[in-house]
Each structure stands twice: as structure tokens, then as C-alpha cells.
Amino acid sequence: MLRRLNSPTAILVRTASTRTEKLEEIRDRLSKGPNFQDFIQNSDNSKDDFENYDGKLRREKGETQQLRLPPWLKTTIPMGKNYAKIKSQLRDLKLSTVCEEARCPNIGECWGGGEHGTQTATIMLMGDTCTRGCRFCSVKTARAPPPLDVNEPVNTAKAISSWGLDYIVLTSVDRDDLPDGGSKHIAETVREIKARNSNIFVECLVPDFRGNLECVQTIAGCGLDVYAHNIETVEKLTPFVRDRRAHYRQTLKVLNEAKQFNPNLITKSSLMLGLGETDAEVEQTMLDLREAGVECLTLGQYMQPTKRHLKVIEYVTPEKFKHWEQRGNELGFLYTASGPLVRSSYKAGEFFITSILANRRKSV
């Protein structure tokens, strides 16, 4: 249901109709675009690697030796003109990216343009230092990070407009030291981006704001198109994987509130595999997300960033990831991206851009 507004009923009806049309347009682009498998390079080779690999994929209880990295998780070294260009622009504007801070294995493909030649980067707002210390994440932590850069919303919008993208992902560190968790800062950034290009799709991968629903509403009502918040792991493992201030049920509450406050948003979450979860627990997490109104889901392999972080319990096979993709579709997710190297913002821009181009060709 729409929230009650101080406006005539006729305006409410027109607003609801406009938002519904916008949502349907986004869904149409998603459904008519390529599926996730279209973006995987050398998929045939990956299948051969899986079928011929005889290495150990799971650590048994009590074992301390690290698992050997299977061939389907090996990626190329970041390089190329596009990669260098984006890195230079980000440094000049003093912007951070989760691609670098979280040591994403896809940085070379996304920044370099990959097979399809499209540059994709995920901007990380509010600095590079988080107030939380999740045991899977390599982003720096501190109780009192540096103050927010008041110029960041404008600088971010300038950078994005110069790249000419159709889709951009904004994420952020947690800022529990701020009264509003930085929600107003994120919302201002979205508005600056939309002011320069009203046609761009903006996805925000945001914190839980410690369950503060006013902060959730600030983001949900700022003009973004996709509200993302990651559940990360199954309920049983949450206390051991995420920071103590992050809670499984709180994540579901945040995602549900965003959807209830603005029903025309697409909501999205992400799940890491390989931390010791069972198939039944993964299934239940997917069901919980659907019940909370989540429409998009990504599943990827957890990879230990440093020796200080949680060890990998299991390297999940591409075949199993394919199973979860199919299960997500059966459960009614708008789309499910599931693969060993999938991350919450992996190839998001390229997905939408390719989809848009495909639709334009059909209409010619």
C-alpha cells in the first residue's frame, strides 16, 4: 500500500500509475535482456574444468590446511586502457570503490569493459573505512572514521556523468558513528546523479542503519531505482560471519520496509556460499527473502581475502550454483544471478545496457 500523502486523491492515483509503469518498464528490460550465463566468458572451458577437477573442495571439521583454489575461480590480472582510465578518474576525484576495497575478483573484467566493452564500477560512498568488522570483509575498520566529504555527492555525480553509463551501483561503508548512518549523504548523491541524467538507473547497496526505519525511508524515497541490502549468509552462521550489530531478521526487516515504503522499487540481496551452510539453510534463506519482497538475488562463492579472515569451508561447484539459479527462478525472483565469481553488483551496468540495446534493435 502507498503511504498516506497530503495530496488530492487524483494526484495519488496518477503518481501510483506513473510509478507502476516505471517498474513495469524496468521489469520488461530485465526479462527481455540476456540472462546471467550470457556474461560468463569461456563457459565451456569452465564446465571442462569442473568435470576434470579432482582436487579437494571441502574442508572437514578440525582441518586447518587451506583448500587449493579450483580453476574456475582463477581470473586475469587487471589491465587495459579502460581499467587505467577509470582508476585515474577515481583518484582525481578522491572517490573509493568497493571493487578495490573488497578486492573483487572481477575488477579487471568490469573496469576493463570485458568482452562487451562496457565499463562498470561500483562507487563506495562515505570513505574507505567502516565502523563494523565483518569476518569476511577486507574493508578497513575503525570506531571513528574520518568525517564525510561534503563534496562527495557532486564529485560522484560528475564522474558518473562523464562515463556515460545507463546503470550505476552506489554502495557504502557502515557509519554507525553518524546519527543517520549517512542515509542523507547517500540520498543526496542519488539526487545529484539524477539531476545530471534523469534516465540513468541507480542501484544503492546500503547498510542496515541498525534497523532505523527512518533512514531506510530516506533512501527508499530519494529517487533510486534498486534498493539493495545484503543478507550475506544463512541465519545460523550470521553471528559468526557478520558484525555483532548485523542481524539476519533485521536485514529482512530493512528490505521489507524499503519495499513497503516505495512499492515501485526493485529490492535486491546477495548470499555468499562456501561458509559451511547446508542446502536446506540456503533454501530457507531464499524463501525468507522472497517473503520480505526481495525480487533480485545474487549468489557467489566466498573467497578468503586475507589470512585474518574466515577460511573457506567449501568451494561450491558451478553445477551447484546453476541449481540455485534455477531454484531462484522457481521461487519467483525477478532474476537470479548465481555463479562462483558473482558478486552483488557484478556486471549490473552491462546487464541493463545490453538489455536496452536488444530492445532498441527489436523496435527498429
From Swiss-Prot:
Transmembrane segments: none annotated. It is an enzyme of class 2 (transferase). Residues 115-334 form the Radical SAM core domain. One of its GO terms (molecular function) is 4 iron, 4 sulfur cluster binding. Its EC number is 2.8.1.8. SMART domains: Elp3. [4Fe-4S] cluster 1 binds at residues 99, 104, 110, 345. Gene3D superfamilies: Aldolase class I. Its cofactor is [4Fe-4S] cluster. Its main location: mitochondrion. HAMAP family: Lipoyl_synth (MF_00206). This protein may be expected to contain an N-terminal transit peptide but none has been predicted. Belongs to the radical SAM superfamily. Lipoyl synthase family. This is Lipoyl synthase, mitochondrial.
